[in-house]
């Protein structure tokens, strides 16, 4: 069945999949930077979310990064910055002066991998497609029925005669991100709390084992 790859994914497998490919990639200079940065991130335990050049208040190079579990601390951002910044300068990938910004995806994050859609199923997202579906290319609705090939969007507002449920293949997406809602904030905070407790529990188990070895 096509759902096997998602329904059989354990929490540990989802967390450890640092090599999961993104659904879409950058173009031009951004694509060049992404290709250069990705091999630098993996040994550090991070994966790329996206690269974006922003022109507000001067040129800003935003590199959005996360750990495979979706977490990203201030210290993590500093680690990535110290690794990436000097090498970008050596490569001279951007000829003009720019500001480097290493950031986490945030709560209203971009959805760039299939596991992102699975992880945030049930929440509202904005989707843009490369082809016209149901007479348009931009959609907003709740993510449901995630499969290996795509998902169903339960749209907020359907025009007269249009279906409220739209099936969207992953191959047809060019942009997707979550919409900030109270429910999303609560769920994101809960997931982060559960993850922190899991790591604390694992650390306690290691300490207990070390104590037993010491006593023996």
From Swiss-Prot:
InterPro entries: Ribosome_maturation_RimP (IPR003728), RimP_C (IPR028998), RimP_C_sf (IPR036847), RimP_N (IPR028989), RimP_N_sf (IPR035956). GO terms for biological process: ribosomal small subunit assembly; translation. The keyword Cytoplasm applies. It is found in: Cytoplasm. Signal peptide: none annotated. It holds the Pfam family RimP_N. Its main location: cytoplasm. SUPFAM superfamilies: YhbC-like, C-terminal domain, YhbC-like, N-terminal domain. The keyword Protein biosynthesis does not apply. GO terms for cellular component: cytosol. It comes from the Bacteria. Keywords: Cytoplasm, Ribosome biogenesis. Gene3D superfamilies: RimP-like superfamily, N-terminal. Belongs to the RimP family. Required for maturation of 30S ribosomal subunits. This is Ribosome maturation factor RimP. It comes from Bartonella henselae (strain ATCC 49882 / DSM 28221 / CCUG 30454 / Houston 1) (Rochalimaea henselae). The gene is rimP.
């Amino acid at each position: 069945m096509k759902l096997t790859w998602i329904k059989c994914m354990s929490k540990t497998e989802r967390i450890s999949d640092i090599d999961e490919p993104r659904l879409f990639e950058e173009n031009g200079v951004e694509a060049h930077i992404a290709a250069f940065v990705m091999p630098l991130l993996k040994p550090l335990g991070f994966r790329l979310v996206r690269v974006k050049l922003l022109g507000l208040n001067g040129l800003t190079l935003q590199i959005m990064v996360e750990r495979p579990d979706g977490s990203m601390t201030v210290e993590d951002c500093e680690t990535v910055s110290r690794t990436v910044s000097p090498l970008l300068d050596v490569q001279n990938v951007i000829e003009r002066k720019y500001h480097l910004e290493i950031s986490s995806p945030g709560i209203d994050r971009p959805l760039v991998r299939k596991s992102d859609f699975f992880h945030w199923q049930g929440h509202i997202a904005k989707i843009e497609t490369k082809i016209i579906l149901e007479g348009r290319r931009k959609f907003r609705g709740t993510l449901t029925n995630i499969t290996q090939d795509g998902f169903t969007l339960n749209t907020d507002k359907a025009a007269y005669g249009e279906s409220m449920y739209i099936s969207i293949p992953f191959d047809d997406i060019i942009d997707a991100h979550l919409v900030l809602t109270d429910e999303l904030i609560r769920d994101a905070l809960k997931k982060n709390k559960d993850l922190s407790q899991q790591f604390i529990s694992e650390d306690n188990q290691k300490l207990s084992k070390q104590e037993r070895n010491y006593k023996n």
